[in-house]
Amino acid sequence: MARLEIRPFSDEYLAHAGELLAARHQAHRAAEPLLPRRYEEPGEAAKEVEALARSEGASGAVALRGSRVVGFLLGIRKRDEIWGPNTWVELAGHAVEQPEDLRDLYAAAAARWVDEDERPRHYALVPASDRALVEAWSRVGFGQQHAYGIREIAAAKWPDEVRLATARDVEGLLDLHPVLSNHQSQSPVFARGLPREGRDALRAEILEDLANEARGDLVHEQEGRIVGSFALAPAELSSVHAGLARPDGAVLLGWAATRPDVRGSGAGVALTEAAFAWAREQGYETMVTDWRVANLLASRFWPARGFRPTFLRLYRHIP
């Protein structure tokens, strides 16, 4: 086998990167057919790579054996106030013929990210079904932080205790809103987010969402009190479930919370059934969602509801 050569990523490698990414996505779709088919075409895959390469601060590396390009890795920057001084390897930001070569690519690219760009927080979105690739990332110091999930939408009946929210529910929804962020901020997640919006700004945002007929905002009531809520919207509105992770015509389950005192009572299951019923009524066939892997409740609840992991967000922080 020819020796591996690592070079900086440049435009001359875009077509090769598209071919590698298309092959990766084809293998991914063999494990999860609900993912979008079009990125099995090298030209479509190359467009995703090019979009990353044109992003501010993009940099990376390619791997060659002889004259053949056998891997690439691209990193971009996102908002520091959310992610810290960061570099992201996005959905279309990497593909290799041999998983071990990913480690060499990362070693080359990360030298710039850390030593020159001073960006020590690294994130990578990796196909969950490719165990060898996930393992290669783990052997350069990455661990699981977040999971994307997908499933077919099952036929379901509306539970009596769940209904669509109306503007009259806004105060109850405001009271419920901190439940998720409070839970995520605790052990073992320790999530950090943006400062909370003021109540008036959040009220206006909720009312705007409730007026949007493309959305499904569900509430679960017990004894006249809203104890849980799910929010659904077209997946096209999501910046997370995009590109290779967004099936055509999918619905996003984008927010979900139940009060701590009703967990285990069936409220979450009832809301899930109502979410399926609403989505089927709207003509959707596929649902996507995501969760923090370290969130013990979510990481058990969503797979138990039939969601299969599609991508894992891996994370490494270099002190």
What label would you give each PLM region?
Residues 1-42, 159-198:
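Short amphipathic alpha-helix that is part of the acyltransferase structural core
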Residues 22-106, 222, 227-249:
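Conserved donor-binding loop and adjoining core beta-sheet/short helix segment
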Residues 59, 119-120, 285:
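Short acidic/polar active-site loop segments enriched in Thr and Asp
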Residues 68, 77-80, 90-159, 311-319:
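Acyl-donor-binding surface of acyltransferase catalytic domains
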Residues 98-112, 255-258, 264-277, 281, ...:
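Conserved acetyl-CoA-binding loop-helix of GNAT-fold acetyltransferases
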Residues 122-125, 253, 287-291:
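Conserved hydrophobic beta-strand within the GNAT/NAT acetyltransferase core sheet
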Residues 132-135, 235-243, 297-300:
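A short, acidic/glycine-rich surface segment
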Residues 209-219, 223-255, 259-269:
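Intrinsically disordered, low-complexity segments enriched in Gly and acidic/Ser/Thr residues
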